[in-house]
Design a protein with these regions (language model features):
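Hydrophobic core of transmembrane alpha-helices in multi-pass small-molecule transporters
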Residues: 57-72, 260-274
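Short amphipathic helix-loop junctions that connect adjacent transmembrane helices
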Residues: 1, 190-206, 210
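Helix-to-loop junctions at the C-terminal end of transmembrane segments
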Residues: 17-30, 221-234, 318
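C-terminal ends and interior cores of transmembrane alpha-helices
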Residues: 39-54, 244-256
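Cytoplasmic helix-loop-helix junction between adjacent transmembrane helices
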Residues: 61-99
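C-terminal membrane-cytosol helix-exit motif in multi-pass small-molecule transporters
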Residues: 132-152, 340-344
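Juxtamembrane intracellular "pre-TM" segments in multi-pass secondary transporters
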Residues: 145-176
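Glycine-rich segments within core transmembrane alpha-helices of 12-TM secondary carriers
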Residues: 92-110, 302-310
Length: 345
């Protein structure tokens, strides 16, 4: 039940500091904000490593929470990319940023596995040291990033309230598509290792392969997603994302074996990609320039709060119910996505 607790704490740190990250960047700029996050994440990883050595569960969770704060800043990369291109190129810019995440499917697990024993007698403490070094690499590239942002002095009355932003059908459509895409994906992905390896006794190697291919499916479509959105429009791509999620749910109704888990998780990753990119790229069309940090921060607060809830509840759900039941619960989210998209159209 608590096997995914650390991941949930990271998500909590991420969602709780979304608005803070956006606010900081509105004051000091993108580059300074990203560098601050990079250094902070490195220190947080070292804290987590030290907590393993001294066997402090509280300190470990604090380190995970601060790592989540770094994630809150890093998710602003997609908005920074959008700001460097025309708005009609936003889907492609976001796709390129997400495509870079394909490396996480292979670099992350392998690096953690290779470095897990470099600190003798403290399994996985070395993995966090490796993470600390890895997070600093981005600082080198950020030194060459030309930030065109200037501190904003917009009067508060020039920006709409959160309620006014939500009242826009397009803004709400984008928000629901992105947040529920993350909710469904996180809810099912987090429960997969428990369902596969613990409950169905499928080998750890096969379980790991399913997760790796799932992550690849999350990011590889980014090669074409931007072009598809430009050709067919945001709403049609969202409907297609819902269809892909539906295949995942349908697969859960059959025997729970390696092949069916593989099919389900691949389509889960594909559906997330289409919904998240279309939702994020639609978001940038629904606010004014002076509202961007406010709208982006609010969007990410909702998206990753929902993700954190999904992550924390996944372990409980899979322990108390079943893989099939968890999939059926997700139908509710898909219906809401369809309704909000239809209403906006």
């Amino acid at each position: 039940m608590f096997s995914n607790f650390a991941n949930g704490i990271i998500n909590c740190g991420c969602c709780n500091l979304r608005n803070f990250a956006a606010k900081i960047m509105s004051i000091i700029g993108r580059r300074a904000g990203f560098i601050l996050a990079s250094v902070g994440s490195s220190l947080a990883a070292l804290m987590a490593s030290y907590s393993i050595i001294i066997e402090s569960f509280v300190l470990f969770n604090l380190g995970c929470f601060l790592l989540g704060a770094g994630v809150a800043f890093s998710h602003q990369y997609r908005f920074a990319a959008v700001e460097t291109v025309n708005k009609d190129m936003a889907p492609k810019a976001i796709s390129i940023i997400l495509l870079a995440g394909i490396g996480s499917a292979f670099i992350g697990p392998n690096l953690a596995n290779i470095s897990k024993e470099i600190i003798s007698d403290h399994l996985y403490a070395g993995s966090y040291v490796a993470l600390a070094i890895l997070t600093l690499f981005s600082t080198i590239f950020l030194l060459f990033y030309e930030d065109n942002h200037r501190p904003s002095n917009f009067v508060k009355k020039n920006t709409r309230s959160y309620f006014e932003l939500i009242a826009q059908p397009r803004f709400l459509q984008a928000l629901i598509a992105s947040s529920f895409a993350y909710a469904v994906m996180t809810f099912l992905m987090t429960a997969t290792p428990i369902s596969m390896h613990v409950m169905e006794k499928i080998s750890l190697a096969k379980t790991g392969l399913v997760i790796q291919l799932h992550i690849a499916a999350m990011f590889l479509p980014s090669l074409i997603t931007g072009n598809l959105i430009k050709k067919f429009g945001h709403s049609k791509i969202m409907y297609f994302g819902v269809l892909l999620f539906s295949i995942t749910i349908l697969t859960s109704l059959f025997e729970q074996n390696f092949i069916n888990y593989l099919i389900a998780l691949i389509f889960l990753g594909l559906g997330w990609n289409f919904l998240f990119i279309s939702g994020t790229s639609l978001l940038v069309l629904s606010y004014k320039e002076e509202e961007k940090f406010k709208a982006q921060g609010f969007n990410d607060l909702i998206v990753y709060t929902v993700q954190a809830i999904a992550s924390l509840s996944a372990g409980i759900f899979i322990s108390l119910t079943s893989w099939k039941t968890m999939n059926l619960v997700c139908i509710i989210f898909l219906i809401i996505i369809v309704i909000s998209t239809f209403r906006a159209d």
